[in-house]
Curated annotation (Swiss-Prot):
Pfam families the UniProt entry points to: ACCA
Gene3D superfamilies: 2-enoyl-CoA Hydratase, Chain A, domain 1
Name this protein carries in UniProt: Acetyl-coenzyme A carboxylase carboxyl transferase subunit alpha
Domain CoA carboxyltransferase C-terminal stretches: 40-293
Keyword Transmembrane helix: no
Signal peptide range: none
Record GO terms (molecular function): acetyl-CoA carboxylase activity; ATP binding; carboxyl- or carbamoyltransferase activity
Catalysed reactions, semicolon-separated: N(6)-carboxybiotinyl-L-lysyl-[protein] + acetyl-CoA = N(6)-biotinyl-L-lysyl-[protein] + malonyl-CoA
Assigned protein family: Belongs to the AccA family.
Amino acid sequence: MHNYLDFEKPISDLEGKIIELKKLATEDESIDTTDEIGRLEVRVREAIVEIYSKLNPWQKTQVARHPQRPHFVDYAKTLFQEFTPLAGDRKFSEDAAIQAGLARFRGQPVAVVGQEKGNDTKTRLKHNFGSPRPEGYRKAIRILEMADRFGLPVISLVDTAGAYPGVGAEERGQAEAIARSTEMCLGVKVPLVSVVIGEGGSGGAIAIATGNKVYMLEHSIYSVISPEGAASILWRDSTRAREAATNMKITAEDLKSLGVIDGIISEPLGGAHRDPDSVIAATGDVIANALGEMASRSGEQLRNERRQKFLNMGRNL
């Protein structure tokens, strides 16, 4: 069953009519609904084009959070072969919000790290809705250290509203863990490619996203805080999230123009949730091109370029 966003009502109405006509044709074979269904399908496509060609930042935020949008586990199943997950931080516990491990990407050994939100009540609770605790970031550090030791390129897939802000997480050193993970990303002497596949929220995202190349899916978002959080702080009114989203410059187009990201990966018509296989394949192509481009560079070059990239970003914004 498709989950429709509020602004997709014209699409849901048309697709609802198509479902009704198909059901009618099934119940009574003497009724031919083929032509009408064809006309409605054309109108559906036109409605999707019209709506998705002029999404505002708040609508893009909703698309980035769509429950049927492909998550890390979907990319891992399709993009990688022999994915072997790593568990635990060897200090406190396991954190399923961060998924990390070794894999093959188009025949090449790589290290993989990303956030997983889950797609139903059970898995969302298991993965803490994609909000990592300190042990998750320390697990990410483990895989980054391993990648650096064995010369494995790192691929990170970012999808989090932010690091978990609970008391226990703070007591166990959340800020330190995020800082160490960011430092490790900046310090490895291997290629590091990061892709924001949904939400890129605050330091919780940056901790695994300081790559040589950083990309965003067309309808993903990347920001220092959620629009609701910004509205609550600025105006003490979370209902002004739409206004905050516009002012914060959180879309892929905004961040590309500001020089924060290196490129935008186009999504299928209607968003990644309408054709997950297509967007996952496109993401794989972009990652492969980025790794190929960096293949001849030395470890020192890669590290220095990455550090300089983010230093320049801080100076120029």
